[in-house]
């Protein structure tokens, strides 16, 4: 029934298995891949006919995690998977980015890649094996895909690179880098680092590229046994159309790209396009070429004109040389009620970034395959259509917004203080108000400033820069702080974020082969210079965190109590903790470890709640005198509430210096008294005394009573002696 083909290899100390022919046989390509006990199914389906009226590759990648993969049932009311989680969106992008450049130019058939996590061993993250499985499925499918690709995760532990570290091993790593590419070239890098130098980052990229070569070889062996016949597809030859477009529009395009203002430049380019269309594909009359063909050729000519100009003259679209960063203006404290805010403007790219501090109640619960955990640092990126002078859809964030937000999150996250040092939930929101390239890096810069404005003690300011590359044969130009047009028309887009000490995040997307390690090294060194310049410009607004939190931010006080005292603070059914919250107005978060966070914008409320809790958990000292209240009387004594919520017994013999016949002769319920803590009996019961305390002054009269008893005994002794004489 099944024609199963299989490849196995030992990779990074664990077995990688690729299998096809048994599951999802109606898909164009399907591979079940296992790494350790993490298993995914990758499928590819591409329509037989192209999608009419489009000028882009209609590729969709969907990565989906199933709760059963980790032996869990989804939370929520419906108990089934719903909309994609942030991780599913991010991994979908991680798979998409290295495979998209490898489709043959001109492929317009709707293509969908679906990767489903079937099993998760909680050791091997499914993202790497998902990328490998998707690559294998595409290679088998027959679509014009110029792969395969390999992928690997690289950690950095004890100054040594580590291939595909487990989830547990990653906790001790100062680097989390994912790299993907073909046999000959790196195509994609995504990373977070703890201020590592550029040479370590580049070394990690090359280490990963070297060590995923066996995976590519295994996919090729599998394809030799199981690949489908390649689709019959011939890309459209645009050379004749391009020649015609160049003759009509080259001079005008060169003039259009001398305009430094984005909207003016776009208007000029549109005018050239209209002229070319009217000449080569008029709406009325005889057309020399198909309209769609002319549009595609015009895009190619646009790119060539810009690229030639940069390589020939060293001058860019907006007149800068290749190393110059656009003018920067940084402002902080721009919103009066926000906890921290910044407006970061770099050329025609602008981000309004706001930092908000919250309490434990504001932590985000993440329901992942590895289990539910809390996230205390949130960074959200919004890209409204007005930022590029357009109208468009508004609503929930798209994949691009989630991806850019996560990139900025990775850049800032390594600089945040530890939770025990700064026990706040932090949310940063970046509103992109203008965009002409590098808005994610503007978000990094604005986030750094907004956090410092809020009083968050970042270890150092962090900045980011987007770099580009133009490569033609042996000639190349690395571009600092790229514009949107340079991003689209260039061969490499990579973003570097970091501090004066090192890199915290590196994202790289390479569109062509031929980019060598040396070119990447030049680009990273140039990015370092650009980052240093940006940090200097940011320092004009703020150099470090403000010494105090923002005026409207909540204050949080932390305290540690013994874990066996947590029940006493909470009380039966939460009675005690509710009373503290209601009477002080403070927010209180109690953790299983005994850490208590008390939050309020009012310092007096924090102090009142702190003292209340301290009185509950503190132990009374033997020999000390405390105020108390009679809560119950019995024949043998009275129970006194003292020292917060503690109750102890004053035995009838300890009520008063004189003999007491009846407890109620001395005290009644509700009486305010002063008691001395004598300690605990062998059963742990608290023993108190009233008779050794002056009920008026609170003075300890133990010695006075001893002296009186001694005097009484002396008088009795003298009386006996006198009677005997």
UniProtKB/Swiss-Prot annotation:
Binding site for Mg(2+): 487, 493
Keywords of the record: Cytoplasm, Magnesium, Metal-binding, Nucleotidyltransferase, RNA-binding, Transferase
The reaction(s) this protein catalyses: RNA(n+1) + phosphate = RNA(n) + a ribonucleoside 5'-diphosphate
Compositionally biased spans, kind Basic and acidic residues: 701-719
Keyword check for Magnesium: yes
InterPro entries, per the entry: ExoRNase_PH_dom1, ExoRNase_PH_dom2, ExoRNase_PH_dom2_sf, KH_dom, KH_dom_type_1, KH_dom_type_1_sf, NA-bd_OB-fold, PNPase
GO cellular component, one term: cytosol
Swiss-Prot/TrEMBL cofactor(s): Mg(2+)
Domain S1 motif per the UniProt entry, residue ranges: 623-691
SUPFAM superfamilies: Eukaryotic type KH-domain (KH-domain type I) (SSF54791), Nucleic acid-binding proteins (SSF50249), Ribonuclease PH domain 2-like (SSF55666), Ribosomal protein S5 domain 2-like (SSF54211)
The KH domain, residue ranges: 554-613
Keyword set includes Metal-binding: yes
Region of interest: Disordered: 697-725
PANTHER family recorded: POLYRIBONUCLEOTIDE NUCLEOTIDYLTRANSFERASE, POLYRIBONUCLEOTIDE NUCLEOTIDYLTRANSFERASE 1, MITOCHONDRIAL
HAMAP family from the UniProt entry: PNPase (MF_01595)
Family note: Belongs to the polyribonucleotide nucleotidyltransferase family.
Protein name as it appears in the record: Polyribonucleotide nucleotidyltransferase
Source organism (scientific name): Methylobacterium nodulans (strain LMG 21967 / CNCM I-2342 / ORS 2060)
Gene that specifies this protein: pnp
